């Protein structure tokens, strides 16, 4: 059924969001008093630049009346806002208590509730969301004939095989429902999507129920005035995925796992667990368990409780990815994939993710460069654990090329240094989505957290120059095995500076070019 002003008003009333409808001198809660109430909207947007005849505009965030200049001439049909804009437009306004919640509900309705045509899987956690999502897509693709869409912080895939770079970990609600509609129209039957804490903080997934929610892990992150004021708030927002799910897949060793189980019990949903054991298969009991077989070749065992399911080899290095694989297998099982389906389980073996644990060897020196998206204490620690387990006996000289995001997650700056300073030889601090903060200020702040007098540190604001210098420095120490850890950006082809995406080659391309690969 097409969305009209009348049906929009009814939907908003149902969720106790509508305050009144205003058009000129008419203030009412009865849409029948608005002449155009039964005319279907031709489009929906939150960007005034995209208004065309018949469009419903959702005014969210820091919206300003000046954005409405000339909007009636563009064909605006109605608007949704927390403030009336009668002085700027003659069109009717749906005045609401919460514009973001309203936008999510109205977007779902406008696009015909596409989530009802998909099995929707939400993946959350502090680390591992992207890799787990890609593994999950591959597993379910193997049994569904490639019918799995993907929303991730790296790419979006709406047809099972074409990947387009994404802007947000979890898209704005309107974009999410639009893409769900496209995916459903493309014949997709499943959707795997990363769900960030901010998605619940700012209602990007309001009204969306997940068929399966996966809660991988939790550790302090995203603590800042513009994200989460405390860890409690961060965890609380993450936990909302459980309240809005039909079943839960849970990391058995996650911090606060007992609380998460309590949430699931209160919601009346079942729980499937996964865990990573040590090489002797000792660890927390779980429904799906992974443990190392041959770490040098990224091989691991998988078991369904006590029943062995076979050995598998990943194309992505890192013991922590065995845990991500176990999570994906548990998720796939939760949506009906048989754990006896060896072909499906083997589908994870060919998965590669640009900018995640990518390794490059320099033909001119004994240097290994690893490009990864590690950007907080947990992920940097996991990366260094992997490096030491794999190459520790070779006594490598390790250089970390890093920065930290501007205007948010301020604790990361100190935590990255704390995770690395006693395990590496050299820091190079550089740009990483510094936004409106001066690059040099962030780098100098991070440098100031170093307490190990033996570690060398350099500040090089330009990221291209920083990576280039790291490679030249490694070649100058050719008598040692050098490992360059270039983290924070992965394969992203831009750096955020003053709210704009400035084109950048990408860490992987810079390394490939310097190494002549």
Predicted stretch roles:
Residues 103-107, 136, 140, 183, ...:
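Buried hydrophobic packing segments
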């Amino acid at each position: 059924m097409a969305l009209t002003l009348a049906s929009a008003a009814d939907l908003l009333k149902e969720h106790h969001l509508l305050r009144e409808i205003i058009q000129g001198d008419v203030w009412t809660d009865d849409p029948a008093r608005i002449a155009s109430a039964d005319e279907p909207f031709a489009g929906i947007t939150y960007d005034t630049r995209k208004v065309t005849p018949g469009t419903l505009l959702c005014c969210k965030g820091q919206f300003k009346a000046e954005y409405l200049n000339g909007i009636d001439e563009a064909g605006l049909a109605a608007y949704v806002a927390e403030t009336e804009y009668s002085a700027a437009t003659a069109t009717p306004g749906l005045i609401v208590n919460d514009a973001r919640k309203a936008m999510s509900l109205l977007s779902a309705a406008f696009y015909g509730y596409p989530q009802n045509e998909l099995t929707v899987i939400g993946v959350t956690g502090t680390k591992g969301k992207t890799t787990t999502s890609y593994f999950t897509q591959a597993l379910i693709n193997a049994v569904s004939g490639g019918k799995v869409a993907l929303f991730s912080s790296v790419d979006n895939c709406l047809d099972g095989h074409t990947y387009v770079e994404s802007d947000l970990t979890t898209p704005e609600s309107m974009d999410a429902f639009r893409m769900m509609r496209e995916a459903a129209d493309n014949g997709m039957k499943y959707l795997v999507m990363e769900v960030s804490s901010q998605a619940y903080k700012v209602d990007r997934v309001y009204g969306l129920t997940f068929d399966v929610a996966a809660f991988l892990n939790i550790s302090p992150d995203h603590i800042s005035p513009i994200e989460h004021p405390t860890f409690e708030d961060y965890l609380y927002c993450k936990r909302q995925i459980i309240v809005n799910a039909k079943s839960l897949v849970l990391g058995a060793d996650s911090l606060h796992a007992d609380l998460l189980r309590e949430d699931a019990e209160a919601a009346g949903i079942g729980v499937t667990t996964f865990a990573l054991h040590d090489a002797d298969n000792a660890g927390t009991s779980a429904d799906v368990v992974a443990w190392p077989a041959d770490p040098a070749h990224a091989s691991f065992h998988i078991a369904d409780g006590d029943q062995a399911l076979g050995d598998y080899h990943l194309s992505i290095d890192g013991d922590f990815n065995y845990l991500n694989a176990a999570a994906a297998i548990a998720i796939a099982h939760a949506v009906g994939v048989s754990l006896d389906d060896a072909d499906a389980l083997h589908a994870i073996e060919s998965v590669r993710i640009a900018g995640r644990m990518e390794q490059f060897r320099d033909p001119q020196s004994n240097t290994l460069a690893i490009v990864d998206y590690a950007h907080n204490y947990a992920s940097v620690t996991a990366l260094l654990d992997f490096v030491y387990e794999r190459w520790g006996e070779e006594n490598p000289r390790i250089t970390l090329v890093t920065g930290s995001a501007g205007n948010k997650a301020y604790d990361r700056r100190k935590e990255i240094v704390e995770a690395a300073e006693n395990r590496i030889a050299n820091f190079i601090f550089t740009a990483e989505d510094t936004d409106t903060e001066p690059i040099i200020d962030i780098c100098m702040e991070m440098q100031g957290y170093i307490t190990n007098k033996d570690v060398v540190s350099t500040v090089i604001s330009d990221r291209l120059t920083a990576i280039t210098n790291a490679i030249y420095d490694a070649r100058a120490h050719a008598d040692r095995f050098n490992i360059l850890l270039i983290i924070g950006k992965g394969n992203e082809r831009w750096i955020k500076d003053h709210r704009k995406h400035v084109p950048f080659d990408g860490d992987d391309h810079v390394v490939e070019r310097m190494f002549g690969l």
